[in-house]
Amino acid sequence: MVNALEVPADLLIRRVARKLKEKYPQVKPPAWAYFAKTGPHKERPPTDRDWWYVRAASILRKLYKSPEPIGIETFRTIYGGRQNRGSAPEHFRKAGGSVPRKILQQLEEAGLVVKVPGRGRTISPAGRSLLDTTAREIMEELVKTRPELERYL
């Protein structure tokens, strides 16, 4: 049985992002998402037009990996980075909180995430199933190019 942790993360996240865009109308970027930066440590907004879906898929995978619920502040820290302050030393800055909050609300509306009062959010059985089936599809494609991976199916 293949799970979401046994396939390359970049392949899984891109494939899940495509599925979120095609099959889940609840997950869609707000109008401001194409113009907003993702945090104070960034100079420009993302160049990828589908960055909202990629971030949503990344959040889903983070929730899949975590044994306990994750809150907005944790996601702000995860997606934060070093801020360039000119000649002054760089410092870590958290990412904005609006993007992960809206994405988690949309994933919750789609039934992929469940809210745990006072602790954050965790992945639902439907979200776990989405990631596991996508991981299996990816592994089946990888087996075609690398037959030695067949024992993991």
Swiss-Prot record:
Keywords: Ribonucleoprotein, Ribosomal protein. It comes from the Archaea. Pfam families: Ribosomal_S19e (PF01090). SMART domains: Ribosomal_S19e. One of its GO terms (cellular component) is cytosolic small ribosomal subunit. GO terms for molecular function: RNA binding; structural constituent of ribosome. The keyword Ribonucleoprotein applies. GO terms for biological process: ribosomal small subunit assembly; translation. May be involved in maturation of the 30S ribosomal subunit. NCBIfam families: PRK09333.1 (NF006811). Part of the 30S ribosomal subunit. Belongs to the eukaryotic ribosomal protein eS19 family. This is Small ribosomal subunit protein eS19. It comes from Aeropyrum pernix (strain ATCC 700893 / DSM 11879 / JCM 9820 / NBRC 100138 / K1).
